[in-house]
């Protein structure tokens, strides 16, 4: 298949989970969550966001996302179940592709960070999608460069699981609204507020539990 005129190899989810993470992260810009937040704050102060599109719309999205992340940083709480599971998993690296203007990333990254904080065996690395399209194009969602996209790998670089760009219940809602030609942005963010970060945590429990065996 092609994206923006470039040939892209698309793998099924099953194929991805049988593969090694073959990309070298050396020489790439990796952010911790706190470094990512600081970078976005500095960018907005200077009238910029991440990515090539520096339009007023993208700047506005980024400003709103900073507000969302600030809110989640203060209010998000992990469930007892996800805390217990995360505490028991072996060493993993979580690589998250994102951009500052992405609304779904603002709703989910703070929760991913809180989960990673529970266990020092988890190394969370945040990378910008548009600077790492070679990685992004190996982990498409339904053929698209949807973000955030998390790739979990073990210490032998085997891909353990992928997640993103949003919890499945919200993904299905977005799919339906797109098919009906509706504007899903306001609806999806209301869903996030009502969900209180429960769905993403439940999905991570289901993804991580098999890795404990």
Regions found by a protein language model. Give the residues of each.
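Non-globular targeting/processing and membrane-anchoring segments
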Residues: 5-7, 11-92, 137-143, 160-213
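Short, surface-exposed basic-aromatic patches at helix termini and helix-loop junctions that form
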Residues: 87, 113-120, 141-144
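Local sequence-structure signature of Cys/Sec-based thiol-disulfide redox active-site neighborhoods
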Residues: 87-114
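Thiol-based oxidoreductase modules, predominantly thioredoxin-like and allied folds used
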Residues: 95-98, 121-135, 146
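Short, well-ordered alpha-helical packing segments
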Residues: 109, 113-116, 147-151
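Short acidic/polar capping segments at secondary-structure boundaries
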Residues: 130-132, 157, 168
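A short, hydrophobic beta-strand/beta-hairpin element that forms part of a small beta-sheet core
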Residues: 147-162
